[in-house]
Amino acid sequence: MCTAIRLTTRDHYFGRNLDLEYSYQETVAITPRRYPFHFRHEGTNSDHFAMIGMAFVVGGMPLYYEATNEKGLSMAGLNFPASAVYHDVKPDCANIASFELIPYILGQCESVQEAK
């Protein structure tokens, strides 16, 4: 079970635990600006905000569990197996895999309003 928490104060507090009895070889990952993110259906993005978080890194691609970008926007990937829906690829849509969502959003959004 994972827990995420956000505190609304004058400052920014965000936290999350990965409460598992086993490891996915997670590590602190820092992705600098202009590091190429290779998305499965959306090509490569090398023009994005820097971010830091916990990730499993595969082939140089950080698969973030949670992260915060340089603008202060934070995001966590939580597990909701009973309500998750995975759609087929659709033309003329942004086709983002679930494991790509955090770098996709945090790479281009400065605020929750932009992310919506």
For each predicted feature, which ranges?
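Alpha/propeptide regions of enzymes that mature by internal proteolysis
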Residues: M75-G77, P91-K116
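A contiguous strand-loop segment
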Residues: M1-C93
